Amino acid sequence: MNHRTVIDVFLNLYEPIGHKPMQGGFPNIKKLVSHIFGEQYELGMDYLQLLYLRPVQKLPILLLVSEERNTGKTTFLNFLKALFQDNVTFNTNEDFRSQFNSDWAGKLLIVVDEVLLSRREDSERLKNLSTTLSYKVEAKGKDRNEISFF
């Protein structure tokens, strides 16, 4: 990937990724993706490829749900963070409740581990974020700015 900090007259907030794809086997990644996606392994690999090659393409929301412990959910989220580096952020309910969101609103992936939706407003906020086309970003001491949100 050819990362550019400025595209035309716009600042590119996407962070460069420090590793490049290479030919060869990837048994550990294949095993993890196969474990998470099961029969939908090819879909999972396509999803990861699209995230890498077309980061601005709107993709479906992934939701990993299991009442069982030690199923690999957190391991998969950590893998996504290692793969996409600074373009991934881990959020908690408090992050979504804060009026200041500039640190996460422009990320490729916003991952949430062990979310507890005890308040109706939390689930409504997540529902809104997962379906909206644009979102207002706010940083401390700065005006709100509307961005495309995918």
Question: What residues fall within each predicted segment?
Answer:
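P-loop NTPase catalytic core of nucleic-acid-dependent motor ATPases
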Residues: N2-V111, S123-L126
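Catalytic acidic motif of RecA-like/P-loop NTPases
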Residues: L116-L117, K127
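AAA+/SF3 P-loop NTPase mechanochemical coupling elements
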Residues: F100-A105, E138-F150
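Active-site-adjacent loop/helix micro-motif of nuclease/hydrolase catalytic cores
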Residues: R119-E121
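Conserved Walker B
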Residues: E114-L116, L133
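Conserved catalytic/switch belt of AAA+ P-loop NTPases
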Residues: S123-N145
